Amino acid sequence: MAIREYLWVSLGGIVGACARYFLSRFTAKITGTSFPWGTLLINITGSFVLGLFLVYTTERVFVDPKWRLLIAIGFCGAYTTFSSYAYESMVYFQQGNWGLFAGNVLANNILCLAAVLGAGALVRSI
């Protein structure tokens, strides 16, 4: 990759990481920290944005590849939180908190998949 491509990914990553941090903190203030609602919200919205962007740009319009670097790889890559989701799930598992473990795993997998599918359906219906 050329240096310019790394810059597009980095720029998207900066914005995505900051958005993730802000939304995670904001959600924790509203919902508390007994369940990782911020991680779930971020994963769902990130999945939706990625699905919307990729379906739109592969099925509807051509975009310059730099936009995929910026949005799909940079922004969504830094914004979504699979590693946080995996860690939080492991903690619940190790604590024997089976309800929160199952709820976290199922909610992230089902709702994120639904967000991507919904975004694709939305783009195709427009």
From Swiss-Prot:
Membrane topology value: Multi-pass membrane protein
> Tell me, what is one Gene Ontology molecular-function annotation carried by this entry?
metal ion binding
Please give the biological process terms from Gene Ontology that the record holds: cellular detoxification of fluoride
- One CC-aspect GO term: plasma membrane
Q: How is its activity regulated?
A: Na(+) is not transported, but it plays an essential structural role and its presence is essential for fluoride channel function.
UniProt keyword terms in alphabetical order = Cell inner membrane, Cell membrane, Ion channel, Ion transport, Membrane, Metal-binding, Sodium, Transmembrane, Transmembrane helix, Transport
Catalyzed reaction equations: fluoride(in) = fluoride(out)
Q: Which residues bind Na(+)?
A: 77, 80
* Transmembrane stretches, start-end: 7-24, 35-55, 69-89, 98-118
Subcellular location(s) per record: Cell inner membrane
Family listed: Belongs to the fluoride channel Fluc/FEX (TC 1.A.43) family.
Please describe what this protein does: Fluoride-specific ion channel. Important for reducing fluoride concentration in the cell, thus reducing its toxicity.
Instruction: Please give the name of this protein.
Output: Fluoride-specific ion channel FluC
